Amino acid sequence: MLAPRRKTRQLMVGKVGVGSDHPISVQSMTTTKTHDINGTLQQIAQLTATGCDIVRVACPKTVDAEALPIIAKKSPIPVIADIHFQPKYIFAAIDAGCAAVRVNPGNIKEFDGRVKEVAKAAGDAGIPIRIGVNGGSLDKRILDKYHGKATPEALVESAMWEAGLFEEHGFGDIAISVKHSDPVLMVEAYRQLAEQSDYPLHLGVTEAGPKFMGTIKSSVAFGALLSQGIGDTIRVSLSADPVEEIKVGDQILQSLNLRPRKLEIVSCPSCGRAQVDVYSLAEEVTEALDGMEVPLRVAVMGCVVNGPGEARDADLGVASGNGKGQIFVKGEVIKTVPESQIVETLIEEAMRIAEEMDPEVLAAASASGMKAEVKVTK
């Protein structure tokens, strides 16, 4: 069982609530040049269609800051401006109507001396600030204290120091992240931070790596924290198309039952008993049913040992063998079809089951914005 959600203060990032009273949101960051307004909005549209709740955009140059008003206005989801080095872009982002601003206190010039101004500007605009501490860019003062090592304690101290400065100026609409490329250190930092504050926490493993490695690192870290009730919004950082970040983030939350499940494909890992190419069949079924936004579990099994017996919890499935497929519903075989007709038959049965579902169940599933993913089981 998952631990109860950690109680936090509540923030609004545009129309998206962040904190323990709200569902855990999934974020991503655009990879376009922000001053390429059309390209950036197009990528935001793709992310939104995949289920992204909040999007972050970089703002390294004046031309990027000048593009923020149009992007913030036209984006279908809240836009967070990601600010490094130059404090002037914080104020530009606030004036542009961004839903929030992420600041990196480790590399913004003379940031401590500008906190009072930032707090007033953000407070007047009614938007939150995320203090985004990163193991790769800690404040030199903190690094010196911890002998040049970005320890969990160093990350937490940096975040709490900056949050304290904002609080001194009467500003408390703060979210915090303490990211590290090492999932173990990252998890420990968030655990310590959760014990010391009630700020909403944005989870992330920074520099997680390419799609496969990054997915593993983020899944391990997020699973450890979310199962303990820690975490209010997440971003899976991948060296890949940002759309993949949303797919992985959605699946992590679904796997922990922190979002309503939609279509789920379960498949056996295959073995010497398999009498069909399970890998190809599972991919074909996934592709055929992708986008079918219903809470339906479909099993693809390579022999009669794994299905329907081991897949009895599936709503629908197939057990293959001898050039045929046994189609089963809720563990009961309803028909046997030639191998060439398996995918077609599963589509037909999935549509039939979906049509018979309770409209309220369908509405709840539709609201979560999920799509199909393959889940391999033993």
UniProtKB/Swiss-Prot annotation:
It catalyses: (2E)-4-hydroxy-3-methylbut-2-enyl diphosphate + oxidized [flavodoxin] + H2O + 2 H(+) = 2-C-methyl-D-erythritol 2,4-cyclic diphosphate + reduced [flavodoxin]. It comes from the Bacteria. Pathway: Isoprenoid biosynthesis; isopentenyl diphosphate biosynthesis via DXP pathway; isopentenyl diphosphate from 1-deoxy-D-xylulose 5-phosphate: step 5/6. Its cofactor is [4Fe-4S] cluster. GO terms for molecular function: 4 iron, 4 sulfur cluster binding; 4-hydroxy-3-methylbut-2-en-1-yl diphosphate synthase activity (ferredoxin); 4-hydroxy-3-methylbut-2-enyl-diphosphate synthase activity (flavodoxin); iron ion binding. Pfam families: GcpE (PF04551). The keyword Iron applies. One of its GO terms (biological process) is terpenoid biosynthetic process. NCBIfam families: ispG_gcpE, PRK00366.1. Belongs to the IspG family. Converts 2C-methyl-D-erythritol 2,4-cyclodiphosphate (ME-2,4cPP) into 1-hydroxy-2-methyl-2-(E)-butenyl 4-diphosphate. This is 4-hydroxy-3-methylbut-2-en-1-yl diphosphate synthase (flavodoxin). It comes from Corynebacterium glutamicum (strain ATCC 13032 / DSM 20300 / JCM 1318 / BCRC 11384 / CCUG 27702 / LMG 3730 / NBRC 12168 / NCIMB 10025 / NRRL B-2784 / 534). The lineage of its organism: Bacteria, Bacillati, Actinomycetota, Actinomycetes, Mycobacteriales.
